[in-house]
Amino acid sequence: MAKSKFERTKPHVNIGTIGHVDHGKTSLTAAITKFFGEFKAYDQIDAAPEERARGITISTAHVEYETENRHYAHVDCPGHADYVKNMITGAAQMDGAILVVSAADGPMPQTREHILLARQVGVPAIVVFLNKVDQVDDSELLDLVELEVRELLSKYDFPGDDVPIVKGSALAALEDKDKSIGEDAVRLLMSEVDKYIPTPERPVDQPFLMPIEDVFSISGRGTVVTGRVERGVIKVGEEIEIIGIRPTSKTTVTGVEMFRKLLDQGQAGDNIGALLRGVDREGIERGQVLAKPGSVTPHTRFKAEAYILTKDEGGRHTPFFTNYRPQFYFRTTDVTGIVTLPEGTEMVMPGDNVAMDVSLIVPIAMEEKLRFAIREGGRTVGAGIVSKIIE
């Protein structure tokens, strides 16, 4: 029996459930699979396998399902720390999130923290599921909780007034009880997710960028750089910029090779070698990027959200303070940077997540949402994401 090819006719979107512990994220995930995918019971999702992303162990459950319009990959994490790590490392990229809030409790500390993280790591859109509505008899109380959630979203720069909020009960949906707050609510939620969470631009449609991994000299032909195309398409004869570490320069791609074969173009996901016109072997190095002119710029100072590994995760054994100088691993190379902690934060303990300012000793091609590892002598001690560029 031939293996069936994965039919991708529908647009693909990555989403996940976020929210406070015990508000019903996993029950809702199970309920969605019940109506839109291959049913996964609560226990199957809750026993999430451990994965390693950028040297950090994270427990994440992955399920997939589809609506009439889209195919979804959905992540759900068992513990709060897993969410923090997941969102900061981007182990599971989220194009949108379903925020689950218990109507009985209203927003709680982790509700706030997950919304803040979603803002910091650039999750584009949030849809809310107000869960456990069968535990609240007073409709005015429900309206109050909804208002609180909207205010909290607005506080962190999400459009609180416009965010869709669906009221229901994941448990009722799982147990085939009260259809109006069970199955109907889950179906309504997914139709809101379909409409409200934007379809991400495919990597191949974005401006060309390729991090340089290696540089070779080929006698009689010139300099070849190799790497995996992160996004966009590069065609032979196109002009590109070389960005980062040194002053930005321009060159023309005179050849593209893959698996030793000559191509007329390379695209997102391809591992290619690019032959560059008039570039000296000494004039280019690992850690720089090739990019469409004007699409990305080099920077040294930025604000970041970072997670610092615990000792058990192989991280530091001691806290660090302002002026900490580790290496920041961007794409393919380490660059030393100096950390400034926010006012009122005396020190950062292993296991914390923190907003910090970083100043690199050389510029790197950078944009918001770019992820990095924090390393000391080649050992990963943290992970982060650029939340804002300063200069």
From Swiss-Prot:
Residues 131-134 are annotated as: G4. Its EC number is 3.6.5.3. It is an enzyme of class 3 (hydrolase). It is found in: Cytoplasm. It comes from Bartonella tribocorum (strain CIP 105476 / IBS 506). Residues 55-59 are annotated as: G2. Keywords: Cytoplasm, Elongation factor, GTP-binding, Hydrolase, Magnesium, Metal-binding, Nucleotide-binding, Protein biosynthesis. The gene is tuf1. GTP hydrolase that promotes the GTP-dependent binding of aminoacyl-tRNA to the A-site of ribosomes during protein biosynthesis. Gene3D superfamilies: P-loop containing nucleotide triphosphate hydrolases, Translation factors. GTP binds at residues 19-26, 76-80, 131-134. Monomer. It holds the Pfam family GTP_EFTU. This is Elongation factor Tu. Mg(2+) binds at residue 26. Belongs to the TRAFAC class translation factor GTPase superfamily. Classic translation factor GTPase family. EF-Tu/EF-1A subfamily. Residues 76-79 are annotated as: G3. Residues 10-201 form the tr-type G domain. InterPro entries: EF-Tu_GTP-bd, EF-Tu_GTPase, EFTu-like_2, EFTU_2, G_TR_CS, P-loop_NTPase, Small_GTP-bd, T_Tr_GTP-bd_dom. The keyword Acyltransferase does not apply. One of its GO terms (cellular component) is cytosol. PANTHER family: ELONGATION FACTOR TU, MITOCHONDRIAL, ELONGATION FACTOR TU-RELATED. GO terms for molecular function: GTP binding; GTPase activity; guanosine tetraphosphate binding; translation elongation factor activity. Residues 169-171 are annotated as: G5. It catalyses: GTP + H2O = GDP + phosphate + H(+). The keyword Coiled coil does not apply. Residues 19-26 are annotated as: G1.
